[in-house]
Amino acid sequence: MSSFGTGKTKEVIFSMEEGSVKMFLRGRPVPMLIPDELAPTYSLDTRSELPSSRLKLDWVYGYRGRDCRANLYLLPTGEVVYFVASVAVLYSVEEQRQRHYLGHNDDIKCLAVHPDMVTIATGQVAGTTKEGKPLPPHVRVWDSVSLSTLHVLGLGVFDRAVCCVAFSKSNGGNLLCAVDESNDHVLSVWDWAKESKVVDSKCSNEAVLVATFHPTDPNLLITCGKSHIYFWSLEGGNLSKRQGLFEKHEKPKYVLCVTFLEGGDVVTGDSGGNLYVWGKGGNRITQEVLGAHDGGVFALCALRDGTLVSGGGRDRRVVLWGSDYSKVQEVEVPEDFGPVRTVAEGRGDTLYVGTTRNSILLGSVHTGFSLLVQGHVEELWGLATHPSRAQFVSCGQDKLVHLWSSETHQPVWSRSIEDPARSAGFHPSGSVLAVGTVTGRWLLLDTDTRDLVAIHTDGNEQISVVSFSPDGAYLAVGSHDNLVYVYTVDQGGRKVSRLGKCSGHSSFITHLDWAQDSTCFVTNSGDYEILYWDAATCKQITSADTVRNVQWATATCVLGFGVFGIWPEGADGTDINAVARSHDGNLLVSADDFGKVHLFSYPCCQPRALSHKYGGHSSHVTNVAFLWDDSMVLTTGGKDTSVLQWRVA
């Protein structure tokens, strides 16, 4: 790094007289106070040290069922394979262990398992790098035992995203088909081991939901989607299609799913709730089950014994059909878990069900289904770790609050609230949890019973931070109305009364940290201001010397002397959403808008400090926190709705 004169780099100015460092975000100066003990030896030219610790992805909470299909399978190893964000997850239910394929750099949209039951293909969307360079959509073929990437297909060929992928089922599975999300929804066939495209063809102007090879005829493919089903023949390097004819049957808005029966018949499920059987090799309907489901048929699965299982959307039913298409048995999935998105055969008579509310269930048509993987359904921002247990809370736009065990990886409890949630914080006793919402309402919940303790409203904008003081005597509530509301707290967090409000920011409150002695707190705002506040009087502290040497209990503010090294060159002030310091004071983790989690040494007070960088999230990473004992880091993905748990090693 070049420095000009004493203490000035391109974007940072060090002033010895003022005892401050000034950085610039969008041309706006952000002055930060240097503690007296560091000032005499401080230099901008000191090299930052990489932390000796690393993060390793330990657990992935969530599943993408909301808008993806046919993405849940049981492997012979006993692992179920599925995806969320940019992670393909291999989850051994018996061993309660996950492995992760991390080869993708943005959202995975589709998944297929090769007939060898070891090789997997996953397709992803187009992304962009931090520098704005496009990351092209592609298919990755990988080994589910070693997790090594075998082949990468279609770089520069696919447009927007790969939405469907499948291996051929006969001829050794040496072909792979894929459909992209270009306007023409191009169907392409690949010799995947050679990474060469055999042929492609425009599929449809409308959305394509499924592309699959016939199980016994390697030259026959089927695609279906919005108001169509096509039967494709692959001959002499050409693809020709025949449209499925609905004739006297009502043409459905969507053909949603397809499977094959032992005799070679094709069965489709559609948005009208009907099952149609298409006779072997033909493009005409030979049998029908009208009204098989109330609402769409979202999933079809042919079991090993030849039985057909269907899964319903609106009616949330899983139905077992006899060989004559009479209902043999049916069971309803509980409403909280949502409509069925995909069904996969397990061991014995068990089934795995993925739902549109991003849950995975395990059970059978005879016994019903119980929760295996709980997911959030919408954008996720709220995260807080319990002060003395291996637990954390997540809450989001879906109005759900989950208290999780980081050891069992299951919710200890879940509850819905009336408003979309934005922020969370535990009382130091751990017995009460505050949750801030987007409406200005905030709640206190009992951590053990999940009962509502109290509900308050401050302003009518979103509550971006709720934070109890370390001694448990105050609660600070930071709002998008530019104010911080301060409450005194009694009865271990169960009783609060408004003390006053802190007025002085000219933009919304983004982050807040308390002093270790609970006398004051510091805030950051949307226009990159750092202000200090006296808790007892709610007055702004304007004297630099009063706050320069304060020991802060936490480091969640993204602007401040101890953390400013997290900002990359040319950063926009909104590029980093959250930061957290380990309780032992040695590590700092940041969450950015580019799907990355960075691990720094603390304090992080050299410009553009060195970090270890980790992918896994696919959209902006919205929040980050250390577990109470610093053994794990938790991160939340915004639109990818996932929570990732990282082991600190």
UniProtKB/Swiss-Prot annotation:
Stored InterPro entries: Beta-prop_EML-like_2nd, Beta-prop_EML_1st, HELP, Quinoprot_gluc/sorb_DH_b-prop, Quinoprotein_ADH-like_sf, WD40/YVTN_repeat-like_dom_sf, WD40_rpt, WD_repeat_EMAP
Any one GO biological process: regulation of microtubule nucleation
| Gene behind the chain | Eml2
Return the domain comment text from this UniProt entry: Contains a tandem atypical propeller in EMLs (TAPE) domain. The N-terminal beta-propeller is formed by canonical WD repeats; in contrast, the second beta-propeller contains one blade that is formed by discontinuous parts of the polypeptide chain.
Q: Indicate the principal place this protein occupies in or around the cell.
A: cytoplasm
Q: Which PROSITE patterns match?
A: WD_REPEATS_2, WD_REPEATS_REGION
- Function (record text): Tubulin binding protein that inhibits microtubule nucleation and growth, resulting in shorter microtubules.
SMART domains, alphabetized: WD40
Per UniProt, subunit arrangement is:
Interacts with GRID2 and may also interact with GRID1. Interacts with EML3. Binds unpolymerized tubulins via its WD repeat region.
Q: Which family does it belong to?
A: Belongs to the WD repeat EMAP family.
In which tissues is this gene expressed? Widely expressed in both brain and peripheral tissues, including brainstem and enrichment in the postsynaptic density, PSD.
WD repeat placement? 56-93, 97-144, 151-192, 195-234, 241-280, 285-323, 369-406, 410-447, 452-489, 495-535, 564-602, 609-648
Q: What are the protein's UniProt keywords?
A: Cytoplasm, Cytoskeleton, Microtubule, Repeat, WD repeat
Top-level taxon of the source organism: Eukaryota
| Upper taxonomic lineage | Eukaryota, Metazoa, Chordata, Craniata, Vertebrata
Region (Tandem atypical propeller in EMLs) residue spans: 10-649
Indicate where this protein resides in the cell. Cytoplasm, Cytoskeleton; Cytoplasm, Cytoskeleton, Spindle
Q: Does the keyword Transport apply?
A: no
GO CC list: cytoplasm; microtubule; mitotic spindle
Listed name of the protein: Echinoderm microtubule-associated protein-like 2
Q: Which GO terms describe its molecular function?
A: ionotropic glutamate receptor binding; microtubule binding; tubulin binding
